[in-house]
């Protein structure tokens, strides 16, 4: 039994991170569609009979009917594949939802908030989703009805949340899930992929197949699974999608003496055009770092943000000449430096000086 498992595509969600780049948000929406097309093409090429979409397929507040029609058109291209959709907290099963009002392809089954079992050949698929934008009901007690069949649970929510967590979205316990005897538990809601192995049982978050910001770094993709009909042995593969990813790039700017040097330093880096970058500046600087100005001076469209984590470089000898509190601090540190012998002690004193100067400059 082969399947694809995905979640959290958030179709038509506003790409706030890309808002200041001309046409980037529209391009990202097109990329979202293309990611779904990639998965459908994979299904066609590999003859996959099941497609699981575990919540937040689209963004209820922003979704366009044209997008729904496009996605449904893709679903019609795979008539022999059974498609199961779980409504999530961003696309709940509510009165004006396209899940309720749109005529979907005949191979699509949409779950509601009530637990339901769908029988398919040698497979029983259980599922339930959201009927509102927030749902913190405890996970319902579920036991599989026929252990001889392959049993799959699909839902959307938080797994093993802390007692201190303020908002819990359909909280679930891995211990209870394990006891319920499912052969595969496909989840959505967490955008980072996670395979949890509980005594051979897989509880899987596929992660989002396309990221929308720097809180979702690195490669994105979907899960391809296979459960042996006889042994029920499970194998999983993560398949990357081609959409642009978000990455962080740490840059030591110590050797930049002027703002222009820093701009040139960044422009000389060979960035991957299929990635969006946030540059994090480290090291020391001896000029005021204006990240917005530097970003505007760059010739690179895929640099989205610059964050300054560098520290000011202080000339302790020059500062000691000042008639000020800063000068007194510098003189005091210089006197102490003459009295210590080890490099470690000197480093501690210089760090104390930097902390003091940073405090003065706040």
Name each model feature, range by range.
Residues 229-362:
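Accessory, non-catalytic peripheral segments of nucleic-acid enzymes
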Residues 188, 194-258:
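A conserved active-site cap/scaffold subdomain adjacent to cofactor or substrate pockets
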Residues 37-47, 142, 256-270:
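A short, well-ordered alpha-helical element
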């Amino acid at each position: 039994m082969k399947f694809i498992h995905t979640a959290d595509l958030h179709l038509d969600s506003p790409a706030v991170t890309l808002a200041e780049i001309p046409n980037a948000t529209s391009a990202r929406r097109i990329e979202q569609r293309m990611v779904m097309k990639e998965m459908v093409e994979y299904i066609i090429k590999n003859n996959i009979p099941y497609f699981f979409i575990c919540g937040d397929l689209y963004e209820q507040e922003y979704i366009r009917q044209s997008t729904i029609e496009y996605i449904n058109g893709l679903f019609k291209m795979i008539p022999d594949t059974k498609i199961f959709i779980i409504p999530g907290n961003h696309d709940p099963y509510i009165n004006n939802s396209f899940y309720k009002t749109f005529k979907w392809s005949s191979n699509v089954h949409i779950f509601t908030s009530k637990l339901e079992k769908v029988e398919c050949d040698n497979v029983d698929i259980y599922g339930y989703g959201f009927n509102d934008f927030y749902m913190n009901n405890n996970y319902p007690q579920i036991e599989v009805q026929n252990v001889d069949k392959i049993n799959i649970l699909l839902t959307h929510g938080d797994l093993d949340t802390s007692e201190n967590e303020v908002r819990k979205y359909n909280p679930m316990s891995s211990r209870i899930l394990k006891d319920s005897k499912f052969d595969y538990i496909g989840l959505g809601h967490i955008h980072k992929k996670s395979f949890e192995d509980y005594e051979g049982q897989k509880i899987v978050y596929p992660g989002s197949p396309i990221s929308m910001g720097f809180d979702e770094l690195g490669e994105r993709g979907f899960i391809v699974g296979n459960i042996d009909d006889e042994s029920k042995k499970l194998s999983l593969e993560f398949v990357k999608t081609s959409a642009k990813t978000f990455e962080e790039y740490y840059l030591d700017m110590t050797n930049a003496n002027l703002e222009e040097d820093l701009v040139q330093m960044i422009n000389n880096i060979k960035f991957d055009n299929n990635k969006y970058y946030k540059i994090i500046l480290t090291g020391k600087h001896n000029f005021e770092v204006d990240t917005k100005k530097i970003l505007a001076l760059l010739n690179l469209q895929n640099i989205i943000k610059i964050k300054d984590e560098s520290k000011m470089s202080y000339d302790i000898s020059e500062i000691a000449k000042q008639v000020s509190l800063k000068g007194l601090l510098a003189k005091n540190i210089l006197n102490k430096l003459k009295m210590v012998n080890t490099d470690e002690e000197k480093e501690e004193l210089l760090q104390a000086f930097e902390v003091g100067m940073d405090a003065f400059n706040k």
